[in-house]
């Protein structure tokens, strides 16, 4: 009796599976993923992990070096500052105002930028031209300078600094999304979809948005890195979070005069800012490469 040999058809992996395989095989992307996950945990639970209070002072233990130093104490792993406060506790608690604040600012700028940029990219004529010239004018001003101007009028505080950074990031985000949407709408597949009777909303949601995801991830990564640096810079200039806040930029500015006496009080907050920006960029680049591989 003859037997029919039936072979199951091998299905190619889907877009998400292909993107995840590409992301998982990228070592730098996984480092960024785990690092950003650690930053998220610190933003939420950093105050609970801190062994001491952020304002708790220990008399007689001022300017102790880190514990691995010859004159360090095990009780103060990263040493103390000029007021006898534990540096590790302040760094752990400072992740929320620096990285957490930057994440909130970036999320708000992304949402507003998506709405305004998509609307601007889908329109033509006078409205698009006016918005384009306004964005070009705002982009001519550096983001940090614009944030300093806003804080100078509003007053120094963390909330005002976050608003100023959001206001500085918004034109760049709107301009980038506007350019991506405008370029996609000029392509042939969009024209074909319009000829088939697809509405503008369907074209934007089902055709344009999936094709600008990689560029959008790049812009979000850049915006988050800029937000971390700008919030820290405003704190360093005493225009953002005010002491005794453990915000990393404020810690860096407060300890600047101790750089020759106690260099760890300057190097540790600066290293925290640098590592945070590096991890965000590693994650963003990995996600962008994975999305491109999945789409292709």
Swiss-Prot record:
A GO term from the CC aspect: plasma membrane
Localization annotation? Cell inner membrane
Record-linked CDD domains: TM_PBP2 (cd06261)
The ABC transmembrane type-1 domain is annotated at 99-284
- Tell me which parts of the chain lie in the Cytoplasmic compartment: 1-28, 120-133, 218-222, 279-296
For membrane topology, the record states:
Multi-pass membrane protein
Cysteine pairs bridged by disulfides in the record: none
GO molecular-function terms, A-Z: putrescine transmembrane transporter activity
> Keyword set for this entry?
Cell inner membrane, Cell membrane, Membrane, Transmembrane, Transmembrane helix, Transport
Which regions face the Periplasmic side of the membrane? Answer: 50-98, 155-196, 244-257
Name a biological process GO annotation. Answer: peptide transport
Consequence of gene disruption: Single mutation, decreased extracellular putrescine, in an sapBCDF operon deletion no change in resistance to antimicrobial peptide LL-37.
Residue ranges crossing the lipid bilayer per the database entry: 29-49, 99-119, 134-154, 197-217, 223-243, 258-278
- Give a short account of what the protein does: Part of a putrescine export transport system, does not play a role in resistance to antimicrobial peptides.
Query: What name does the UniProt record give this protein?
Result: Putrescine export system permease protein SapC
């Amino acid at each position: 009796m003859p037997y029919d040999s039936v072979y199951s058809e091998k299905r190619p992996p889907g877009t998400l599976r292909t993107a995840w395989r590409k992301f998982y095989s990228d070592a730098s992307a996984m480092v960024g993923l785990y690092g950003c996950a650690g930053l998220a945990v610190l933003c939420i639970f950093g105050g609970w992990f801190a062994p001491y209070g952020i304002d708790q002072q220990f008399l007689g233990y001022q300017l102790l070096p880190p514990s691995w130093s010859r004159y360090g104490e095990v009780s103060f792993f990263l040493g103390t500052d000029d007021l006898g406060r534990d540096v590790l506790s302040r760094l752990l608690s400072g992740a929320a105002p620096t990285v957490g604040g930057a994440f909130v600012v970036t999320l708000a700028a992304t949402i507003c930028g998506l709405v305004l940029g998509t609307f601007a990219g889908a329109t033509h004529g006078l409205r698009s031209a006016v918005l384009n010239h306004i964005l070009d004018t705002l982009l001519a001003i550096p983001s940090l300078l614009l944030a300093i101007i806003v804080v100078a009028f509003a007053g120094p505080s963390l909330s005002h600094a976050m608003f100023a950074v959001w206001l500085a990031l918004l034109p760049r985000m709107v301009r980038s999304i506007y350019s991506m949407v405008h370029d996609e709408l000029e392509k042939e597949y969009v024209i074909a979809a319009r000829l088939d009777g697809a509405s503008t909303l369907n074209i934007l949601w089902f055709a344009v948005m999936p094709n600008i995801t990689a560029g959008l991830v790049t812009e979000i990564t850049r915006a988050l890195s800029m937000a971390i640096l700008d919030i820290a810079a405003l704190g360093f200039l005493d225009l953002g979070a005010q002491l005794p806040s453990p915000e990393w930029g404020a810690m860096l500015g407060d300890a600047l005069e101790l750089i020759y006496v106690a260099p760890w009080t300057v190097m540790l907050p600066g290293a925290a800012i640098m590592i945070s920006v590096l991890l965000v960029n590693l994650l963003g680049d990995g996600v962008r490469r994975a999305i491109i591989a999945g789409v292709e």
